[in-house]
Amino acid sequence: MAEPSPSEELASQVNGVYYLTGIRWKNNEPSLRVQIDGAPSTVLVEARGLNLRFRTDVEKPGRCLGRIERSVEGSSYVECLSPSTRGRRCERCQVIENVSAANMHQAHRKGRDSIDQRMAEYLSHPHRLYVAIFRDGSTKVGTTRGSDGGQRLVEQGAWFAKYVAHVEDGFLVRELEDVVSKSINLGQAVDTRKKFAGHLRGQRNSELETTLKDLTFEVEKVLQTQERDGWVSLDE
């Protein structure tokens, strides 16, 4: 007899307590990362077509969302079974996340020798520079690790996007990102609440595509002024 799938198992335990700790994207398909109260590890549940009906158990403490570790191999999720004490994470995971984020986003200013070795190895890998637009018309410039872009744009929730440069590593790509941001006043982040709200009052696709095309043209003009080695233009 076949074992029940994770979603069937969750559905059968209607009185159980579950912690939704994140979403994992693989091959452009989303899965929910779920912890079952008392279980030793995380279960991945396919999200496409999943119907969720739940009650919030106010008597139970929140659960830490875990953290992301980065190394030469890429990014990996580290689960944590501790209660959340600082926002959505436990104190230890939050401190590690804060240090990791500071090292990653300030690496090009701090220098390779001034950040954690594992982060330096993570960044010593080809990256891409992209321009993205979201459903409400919000725009940003961003970076993603890997020669093919990976799952980053899907994770970000971009409605449309263009890759504008292939860069030799994560240090140089962030220098280019900063140049673009300062030159045309283009932000590097969009609030998650705006991303969600945009699906309720989204702009027409034709409007978004036109805005992105015009913005990409401006970004490309900025990049053409950068006479340095280590990157090439993209139009993808």
Placement of each model-derived feature along the sequence:
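Non-catalytic accessory segments flanking enzymatic or RNA/DNA-binding domains
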Residues: 1-236
